[in-house]
């Protein structure tokens, strides 16, 4: 593979990762389809995907840095809450409660989860995750009990963490599981999305570092330019995607995302079966 060809592949996959990582559409499903079509598969490809995920995570840190610092008691400038909202109550405890279920199950069943990473499982989870998004829109309370992040209770945070366990099934979409769970627990669509992003930082960072440690032997000096292009591309595109997504969900429901998941599931079937 020529240098220019590999850099082009890195840029394409970086765009795919950045666009889909935090949307409820399954970045895994998109990555396996695009990677297969580009002929970029195997151990190096898996390590590459781990590295560019760090770019997406960094985008969340940049977007929510004030809120992230606030979780540990460090505040900059004006308070985060707007007029009429409750005083800042989202704490590190909410994040920890949201992490515990998936961390425990993820560590216990890590090898089993990795064995589920194949096109047929991803196809099924795309469909199931789409159905969950539809259920969340149809069954959510008419008036959210937690319209803002700072209105969330510890119980809601923990239950969102339980829903996040669904994302251990490859292809389900971590954001899709957590946002749907939040809405079903009475958290507004916007606040559930914000909490999903905040929860992604420690969850994805931990999982990515663990995977990178296990995949380190497949990384060579010759791969660094390709990995760097993918990382930077994923970071920039994820920044744009997060900003756009948060504006979009103020105006539309998640039904279009659910339908899109069904289309991607059909694409997986066509490409691999």
Curated annotation (Swiss-Prot):
The chain crosses the membrane at residues 6-26, 45-65, 90-110, 116-136, 190-210, 222-242, 252-272. InterPro entries: UppP. GO terms for molecular function: undecaprenyl-diphosphatase activity. It catalyses: di-trans,octa-cis-undecaprenyl diphosphate + H2O = di-trans,octa-cis-undecaprenyl phosphate + phosphate + H(+). It is a multi-pass membrane protein. GO terms for cellular component: plasma membrane. Keywords: Antibiotic resistance, Cell inner membrane, Cell membrane, Cell shape, Cell wall biogenesis/degradation, Hydrolase, Membrane, Peptidoglycan synthesis, Transmembrane, Transmembrane helix. Its EC number is 3.6.1.27. It is an enzyme of class 3 (hydrolase). Pfam families: BacA. Disulfide bonds: none annotated. GO terms for biological process: cell wall organization; peptidoglycan biosynthetic process; regulation of cell shape; response to antibiotic. It is found in: Cell inner membrane. Belongs to the UppP family. Bacitracin is thought to be involved in the inhibition of peptidoglycan synthesis by sequestering undecaprenyl diphosphate, thereby reducing the pool of lipid carrier available. Catalyzes the dephosphorylation of undecaprenyl diphosphate (UPP). Confers resistance to bacitracin. This is Undecaprenyl-diphosphatase. The lineage of its organism: Bacteria, Pseudomonadati, Pseudomonadota, Gammaproteobacteria, Enterobacterales. The gene is uppP.
């Amino acid at each position: 593979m020529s240098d220019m060809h590999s850099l082009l592949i890195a840029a394409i996959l970086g765009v795919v990762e950045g666009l889909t990582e935090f949307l409820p559409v399954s970045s895994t499903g998109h990555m396996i389809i695009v990677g297969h079509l580009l002929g970029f598969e195997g151990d190096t490809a898996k390590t590459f995907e781990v590295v560019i995920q760090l770019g997406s995570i960094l985008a969340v840190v940049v977007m929510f840095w004030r809120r992230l610092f606030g979780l540990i008691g460090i505040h900059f400038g004006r308070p985060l809450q707007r007029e009429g909202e409750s005083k800042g109550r989202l704490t590190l405890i909410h994040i920890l409660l949201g992490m515990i279920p998936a961390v425990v199950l993820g560590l216990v069943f890590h090898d089993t989860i990795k064995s589920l990473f194949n096109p047929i499982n991803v196809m099924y989870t795309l469909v199931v995750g789409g159905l969950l998004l539809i259920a969340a829109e149809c069954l959510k309370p008419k008036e959210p009990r937690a319209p803002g992040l700072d209105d969330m209770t510890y119980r809601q945070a923990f239950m969102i963490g339980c829903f996040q366990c669904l994302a251990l099934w490859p292809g389900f979409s971590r954001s899709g599981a957590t946002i749907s769970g939040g809405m079903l627990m009475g958290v507004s669509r916007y606040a559930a999305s914000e909490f999903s992003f905040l929860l992604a930082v420690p969850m994805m960072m931990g999982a990515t570092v663990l995977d990178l440690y296990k995949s380190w032997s497949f990384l060579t000096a010759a791969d660094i330019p390709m990995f760097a292009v993918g990382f930077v591309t994923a970071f920039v595109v994820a920044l744009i995607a997060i900003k756009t997504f948060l504006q979009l969900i103020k105006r539309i429901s998640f039904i279009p995302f659910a339908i899109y998941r069904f289309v991607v599931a059909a694409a997986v079937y066509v490409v691999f079966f």
